[in-house]
UniProtKB/Swiss-Prot annotation:
One of its GO terms (biological process) is protein complex oligomerization. GO terms for cellular component: cytoplasm. Gene3D superfamilies: 3.30.1360.40, Winged helix-like DNA-binding domain superfamily/Winged helix DNA-binding domain (1.10.10.10). GO terms for molecular function: arginine binding; DNA binding; DNA-binding transcription factor activity. It is found in: Cytoplasm. Belongs to the ArgR family. Regulates arginine biosynthesis genes. Pathway: Amino-acid biosynthesis; L-arginine biosynthesis [regulation]. This is Arginine repressor. It comes from Proteus mirabilis (strain HI4320). Keywords: Amino-acid biosynthesis, Arginine biosynthesis, Cytoplasm, DNA-binding, Repressor, Transcription, Transcription regulation. PANTHER family: ARGININE REPRESSOR (PTHR34471:SF1).
Length: 156
């Protein structure tokens, strides 16, 4: 069983390796960590860590598919202000579309619905990272968009 300091060292080393954007397989990550002195590491542990930290495979500058930790899709934490979870707000003639960090849409939609008609919100529908919000009678989508922008202190 690893001591907490060794676990923290493993996490730091793991994140540092992924920032290099040169590992195309989990096996390569295992080998690199073993070479760094983490001998009790295997592919299944790497797989769990990749999932836990939200790692994705993407193309690097050399157009190779590699694992990385995308900063814009960071996992929300207890200390994340809600405004940091809202990525984009747009509208058309009938609906306001709000894009959030993955997993944050239902939280943001619940907040919007709690404000209700007084703020111009008739209702909201949320998926994983997208919210559709429709204006209450007497409000335009542009007014609703502006109210939501002000609520989240955004300048999009």
């Amino acid at each position: 069983m690893r001591t907490p300091s060794k676990q923290e060292d493993l996490v730091k080393a793991f994140k540092a390796l992924l920032k290099e954007e040169k590992f195309s397989s989990q096996g390569e990550i295992v080998t690199a960590l073993q070479e760094a002195g983490f001998d009790n590491i295997n592919q299944s542990k790497i797989s769990r860590m990749l999932t836990k930290f939200g790692a994705v495979r993407t193309r690097n500058a050399k157009m190779e598919m590699v694992y990385c930790l995308p900063t814009e899709l960071g996992v929300p934490t207890a200390s994340s202000p809600l405004k940091n979870l809202v990525l984009d707000i747009d509208h058309n003639h009938s609906v306001v579309v709000i894009r959030t960090s993955p997993g944050a849409a239902q939280l943001i939609a619940r907040l919007l619905d709690s404000l209700g008609k007084a703020e111009g919100i008739l209702g909201s529908i949320a998926g994983d990272d997208t919210i559709f919000s429709t204006p209450a009678p007497g409000f335009s989508t542009e007014e609703l968009r502006d109210a939501i922008l002000n609520l989240f202190d955004q300048e999009l």
